[in-house]
Amino acid sequence: LWVTLDNGIAQIHVNSPIYFYEPLEAQIGMVHDMVIEKGIVYLATNQGLYALSENDSYPTLIPGTQEQTWYISDVGNQLIAGHNTGTLQLEGRKATQIPGPNGGGTALRKTIIHGKEVLLQMSYRPLSVFTRDMVTNRWKFSHNVEGFSNLIKSFEVDPTGNIWASHMYKGIYRLRLNEDLRSVQEMEYIGKLEEGNELSLI
């Protein structure tokens, strides 16, 4: 569809699958992550964790989640969010803190290392391990990994079990954990690549 305007011509893609959302009232800040679960859109932002459903005019803040929320992740039977105050579990529009690590969860990955299925969470400082409770089938905090404490924004785990962690401001770390996942067995800091190559965020 072509439209003639006072200052030119505009093309409108009528059947485009892309929608643009412009909030009318809520100032939700910068969006870091998003998940859609049971008809609710969850937005992890630097102002808190917001929810938006079909019947809502604009996103609303989930109570108790003010401040920085780095990620929200669907790990099968749980929605988990990394928040300034700790690791949150979401049910509908209710957030409760998972006992264990304190504050600053920046990224979460479900992975298998040394034959163990775990959740790994990076944060402002420690690397945390979550294991599945065999009774409730829910993820729970297990322990912090010894030997690594850094400000990590994102990470990935490769098929051989190497953890590649991107620092908030400088370089990348390659980590290997010991068999019981309780300490770092190997650590390599990669500050720069060979001349002509550039580092990028993981």
Where are these regions (language model features)?
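Carboxylate-rich, polar loop motifs that coordinate divalent cations or form catalytic acidic clusters
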Residues: 1-202
